[in-house]
Curated annotation (Swiss-Prot):
It comes from Methanothermobacter thermautotrophicus. Gene3D superfamilies: Immunoglobulins. It comes from the Archaea. The lineage of its organism: Archaea, Methanobacteriati, Methanobacteriota, Methanomada group, Methanobacteria. Pfam families: DUF11 (PF01345). This is Uncharacterized protein ORF5'. Keywords: Plasmid. InterPro entries: Chlamydia_OmcB, DUF11_rpt, Ig-like_fold, OmcB-like_DUF11.
Amino acid sequence: MRNGTLLLAALLAVFILAGSSAAADVGVELDKNNTKPVYNSTLRVKVIAKAGNQNVQNAVATVKVPEGLVLQDYYTAQGYYDLETGTWEIGDIPAYEERSLTLVCLLNRTGNVTVTANVTADGDENPANNNAQLKFRVRGIADLELNVTSSKQSARLGDTVTFNVKLKNRGPHAANNINVANFFSGGLAIQSYSYTTGYFDDVAREWILETLDTGEEATLTVVCLVNRTGDLSDYVSVREVDEGDVNVYNNIARASVAVKGTDLDLDLSVSKPRAYQGDVVNVVCRVKNNGPEAAQNARVNLQLPANLQVQNVQVDRGTYSNGVWVIGDLADNEAALLNITARVVSAGNFTVNATAVSPAIDDSNPVNNDDTALVSAAIPKKALKVRIKNNSAVTIRVLLYVNINDHGKITRKTYNFYLKNGLSRDLSLGYFQLGTSALFKQYTYNTNYRPRTVSYENTYNATSVITQRVNVSGVKGRQKAPVVRIATLLLDENGTSLQ
């Protein structure tokens, strides 16, 4: 808007110079900062009487304010101003000095206005230049109301949408030289337009109206082709008008249309959210296009963490390589499936992330493009058992010391028992994680009075079964000299080893 308030005062100045014929002069100036007075606003008219190179006496100025300018106040540095006659009795003015009168007027009319002033003084030998005239135009006020509507609330690519812009002048005066700007979103290509008055510049996208009378309404209709997704709109604004507008808040309007693209809905899951090191899990990713537009060159970024080692990949369409699943085009309501078989190679808590994108077409609902699956992998615990069988012909005594190191946690156990010929004893040492080591120190005694052959069989059962056989002849009797065996057992996911 050129003028958004009617309370802004304009200042007009009338200069009247008086003095001897050698120096007298008269002139009129308009303050260029306030060149467009508006109806019902306040205007200051300033009259200045200035002496030339000689003193002037009994200076009197007459200022005629035309009808429609309501004098509200005045002030002067010298003299007296008569409101009824418009006479300003100035008095004496020393050489080269000036005296001023300011009239504060309410502009209660529109159109062309002329203010005249005349000054006389004793000793003025050049009265011909003692007249001044100030002409200006008072603009009216208008309340321009702007509205815009869209023919569709939602649309698809390739549709056409019609925007109807309505401009109404609610007065009280006619509006002139109106410029209404249309700001169309990218993705709205103008196909055609029509208007009831004025003209439309489709390059500048400006609707120009010469005059809009009080109560009159004008319409601009613009048909646009939709070639992009998203929330597209026509934002309209009254950019210029000669008249002052008493209500600038209804000078702008906006109409929008929602253009949906694709809606890639991604779901990610794992077959074992709680797993153990060494387990095999399936990472399943499903992508569905909820439409309405086809997804072009759809792809999913799915990079497995280092804790998972890919064993096999199955896709019902596209290819998966280096953490990227290239699907291709997905039609409306079409889905694709990716199944990755992976082995848990280390324990810990880790996250699998997946993101679906369709670079060629905007996704109208990006909230469901991402998903996350959590896996908590622990080191598995295995039962450690030992069976000791006496294969000797005599009763034996077993003294067994076990020192178990489960990743720094030490467990010590001691067993002392007798075994008759052909009998066995089962020992359950507890549950331990993979990577545990167990040190066995076994002392086996001959309980007979005479030297005998000591023969026994130890079966270790953990991640696998391993058997240790010992056969020593000539072992002293009466438990004097035991058979000593030291062995270290390692619990590994690939099996149990004995050293």
